[in-house]
């Protein structure tokens, strides 16, 4: 389960970056970066989150993108940048402040920065729950007078927020689908363990408390699976804008569901459930991480409430 996205070349952030380049990239940008990404020849990174601001509000971002003749100069700091510490990462999509005096949602831009550009400095690798996370790892970077050609700008100055929103919407579906599959695997492991393990003279599967945890987990997984399928169907039919309530719903529901199922599986496994002998700790870590990544629960709850009130009151 945990390596399936790598096998099918749809890992985050590559999938989202490929969508950005396919939708907004110039033919030259697509030839240079999209084609090798689609072929699985290289990896990419998406640098958005910053340590010094609340990055759940994308309009807070402070990394400076300043034009200087035929180049843009980048100065600032990014962290939780996935993939950028591995050797196959060749390109970074960096979101930063380019037009500070523009309206709030037109201040930022997204620009292509080759990973080997002078001035990109690795501050430190980052670990989730003190463990290496994701196939590409996470890291904090400092950008000091990083220069790239003006032709590396994606779509145009001031389009960064639009690009980020379009990119993150489908990504939240990917999280949901991944977590449904991961939770299903935890349930399978939990059932096998309950049938195999004997305590106080009977199998764990005969104990009412364990039965209830298994039943509750199956209900939770199926509810989330159906919600995700419904959300994807609406996304296909109506696009990102029409699916906005469902994007928030799956982003809220799936990580919480998977975290709860993994927690129950841990409890059934006992000590084995918290060590490296099963993937359950990985699922728990991923689920908890996803409650913050791509927008925390609280942001999506508020967004969903606003959309619901507007929809139901006219």
What are these regions (language model features)?
Residues 18-24, 46, 101:
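Flexible, glycine-rich active-site loops centered on histidine and acidic residues
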Residues 52-56, 82-87, 100-102, 128-137:
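Short Gly/Pro-enriched turn/cap motifs at secondary-structure boundaries
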